[in-house]
């Protein structure tokens, strides 16, 4: 079977030219050259989504136009008048199949146009790559796959009568109504046609991809024409599968895991080991920096109760012994902390250390005055919580020893008027050994609370204070608990002379500030349709009335977290 010979290309493929004689007897030659041929395209289909996923012909076709003028009898001497010629040019593109198809017996079904996009281009006069007129088609797409050609038709609109054809009738080229534009179709003339080389339109699965923009496209885009420029290769590789399409290679997995995983503390010697996170919320003592072999704090130990074995103990710094004071039992001298230490500067050990024991600090006697009582001092370095410094003597339970009593530091760090005036009764240290059994009678605890008062700066005769164990407080407290003045006056450990006053306000300030004291009459809440100008507001009890009312009624007494007793009016009575 003989093979069919390939079809000969049309005579006007890639290049085409035509000449005509003007009315003045000059010869004009038009020459079209397809400088950039279309190579590939992706079928966009004819459905509803075809316009959303439309791919242009790649690369965009570019057609060059040149106009020459010469004598009709001398074709060798031609002059390029492309820039000087006064006319408008349009190039219209159509699509045709590369191979002609035989016509069927039946009429074909009406179909939508295969070519879509912008098929018309105006001339652009550019200096590069050479001075000529260029037609660019950056937005041409084909709906169906196959092999096609682009057919370009040149149309001219003459502006001067001398440039019309030789046998054309004389018409007025001037517009009788300058304000109204003329219809250009009256002066459009078809000049010539040129076709491109065949190119293939692929389906979406077979499309090889878009190539980088050509140098001609870049040059045209640099001169202001609208051409899409692609700087990277977007060709699809066939045959072999890329190994980096999946995240299963070991290098990538290791690189991604190293950024977020915890470093191995048992790694190689050359690997730096980071300090592990601690469950403590206190600050770190700079005198004991963490090293590579630092132990992690046990996560099971509580911060305010039982504490496990500490990894190290803090030594006591040496300091001069204060002046001796006559006491019943001699106490070993304990140097105070350096002045630079403050209650907020603590080590990372939590409250209630059970492994280290330190004696109480021995302070020199100072005159008892109101200013002396309010002035704080720096106790020895304690292992209390950094955020909640303890302000009272710590409890002692059988089997454990706790640091001795410390003077409250909250009163010096906060203003006195910043908190509601509550009647606070700190427990008084008792002179009893740590191993002495305690009575289970609640009345004994009441007597201890009655004799509690503001501590003086003179040291007590006992080294370690003894307090009753933590127990659930009963609701029936005697009324004499709210009268610390009588109990304090009977206590031998307090010597209040004339002109001296208590550190705690024991007057008529048993509860929070009243609403009237804070906001006044106009800011009180209104109930049951009341108005601000009425006098039917329920008046609250005065301070004296509340004192009498509280003395005849039960008060709400509770023990604060630092160990001091506080009484407060019941919310139902306020």
UniProtKB/Swiss-Prot annotation:
Keyword flag Transmembrane: no
Domain of life from the UniProt record: Eukaryota
Q: Where is this region: PEST?
A: 457-501
Comp. bias (Pro residues): 314-323, 330-341
Query: Which BP terms from GO are recorded?
Result: sporulation resulting in formation of a cellular spore
The UniProt comment on domains reads: The C-terminal PEST domain is a region rich in proline, glutamic acid, serine and threonine residues that is required for the light-dependent regulation of development and secondary metabolism.
Q: What does this protein do?
A: Component of the velvet transcription factor complex that controls sexual/asexual developmental ratio in response to light, promoting sexual development in the darkness while stimulating asexual sporulation under illumination. The velvet complex hat acts as a global regulator for secondary metabolite gene expression. Controls the expression of the aflatoxin gene cluster. Required for the expression of aflR and aflJ. Mediates the coordination of aflatoxigenic vesicles (aflatoxisomes) development with aflatoxin gene expression.
Q: What protein am I looking at?
A: Developmental and secondary metabolism regulator veA
Print the organism lineage. Eukaryota, Fungi, Dikarya, Ascomycota, Pezizomycotina
